[in-house]
UniProtKB/Swiss-Prot annotation:
Description of how the protein assembles with itself and partners: Component of the cytochrome c oxidase (complex IV, CIV), a multisubunit enzyme composed of 14 subunits. The complex is composed of a catalytic core of 3 subunits MT-CO1, MT-CO2 and MT-CO3, encoded in the mitochondrial DNA, and 11 supernumerary subunits COX4I, COX5A, COX5B, COX6A, COX6B, COX6C, COX7A, COX7B, COX7C, COX8 and NDUFA4, which are encoded in the nuclear genome.
Catalytic reaction(s) noted: 4 Fe(II)-[cytochrome c] + O2 + 8 H(+)(in) = 4 Fe(III)-[cytochrome c] + 2 H2O + 4 H(+)(out)
Bilayer-spanning residue ranges: 15-45
PANTHER family: CYTOCHROME C OXIDASE SUBUNIT 2 (PTHR22888:SF9), CYTOCHROME C OXIDASE, SUBUNIT II (PTHR22888)
One GO-annotated biological process of the protein: ATP synthesis coupled electron transport
Biological role: Component of the cytochrome c oxidase, the last enzyme in the mitochondrial electron transport chain which drives oxidative phosphorylation. The respiratory chain contains 3 multisubunit complexes succinate dehydrogenase (complex II, CII), ubiquinol-cytochrome c oxidoreductase (cytochrome b-c1 complex, complex III, CIII) and cytochrome c oxidase (complex IV, CIV), that cooperate to transfer electrons derived from NADH and succinate to molecular oxygen, creating an electrochemical gradient over the inner membrane that drives transmembrane transport and the ATP synthase.
Name of the protein: Cytochrome c oxidase subunit 2
Alphabetized UniProt keyword annotations: Copper, Electron transport, Membrane, Mitochondrion, Mitochondrion inner membrane, Respiratory chain, Translocase, Transmembrane, Transmembrane helix, Transport
Length: 74
């Protein structure tokens, strides 16, 4: 039974729902790992001192293009 403050999904009542719960957990882990990797790359690019100004001309707009869709989806 679901509760108002419950963060996860309800308990499965059928085998199909059980598989959907496993798929949800697996997909959520993949999304988390990809988001962590993208965040690490952005932080590494912003904080490094060894950048060429011609290589990273529009770094700020690229960060916005990367982060904004993630924020909208969350």
């Amino acid at each position: 039974m679901a509760h108002p403050s419950q963060l996860g999904l309800q308990d499965a009542a059928s085998p199909v729902m059980e598989e959907l719960l496993h798929f949800h957990d697996h997909a959520l882990m993949i999304v988390f790992l990809i988001s962590t990797l993208v965040l690490y790359i952005i932080v590494a690019m912003v904080s490094t001192k060894l950048t060429d100004k011609y290589t990273i001309d529009s770094q700020e707009i690229e960060i916005v293009w990367t982060v904004l869709p993630a924020v909208i989806l969350i």
